[in-house]
């Protein structure tokens, strides 16, 4: 869509809003003008403009955001208008500043911390909801988790203490392990806190640690090869945006190098990883609908506490276990929320 066409179409949004825009029984409030929600995510794979993400990530992130809106009675084109940043121009991704100026949204939804930081630089007044915040206090996005205080709020999908559980899981699948490999991504705000916690958990049980950092997709093969060359017994992969997006690549290389691998996100296991234990990102992105609803009803984002997932998700891929000749304990399988045959 060209810039002139896009601006022209924006003028039609409000005109399409007639009397009552919500179905009877909907929890959403009737309004005369449909609220506008700006989606600040990246474009899909194959898009002509800028960085793109695989379809399964769009389904995970944007798809569950849409489901979350629906839980509160909101539907694009009927009760709200959702404008995607990557749809604004045909040849590039709009900047956050352009999105704010042209769309004038009532709420901005940012998939992850990077987009939340960019959105916060573009506006200090429009509410911003983030589905996967990290290190938000240190980055100046919020004052505190209990009372954000500014225009940013949302969900933090990292739970302190989770690394200890992941190390315990690693020992379950590799009970004789003495050396653990860490595939890190230290330029992601979520990286350093995880590494610190994982190292502390390993030190507590006298498990040595070897790190290999990957900050671009091209770094991943070399990083996993380095861990294999160091003869690590099991690998823990950090929960970061890059390593999630590249989960298929990581799963394939780990299998090739015969590395039993523990992840934090179930999506890795769906795409060939061995086991995962961590938050369910599907819940995180559905939960953005709750925050959007609260804000559209008049709540200030600074008064909405940051939320954390209350349930952790255990996934096991038995096909990968068989290929790696790893015996998954029956007790672990019995605890599994998701077992891939």
What do the predicted segments below correspond to?
Residues 1-341:
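Short hydrophobic alpha-helices and adjacent helix-cap/hinge residues
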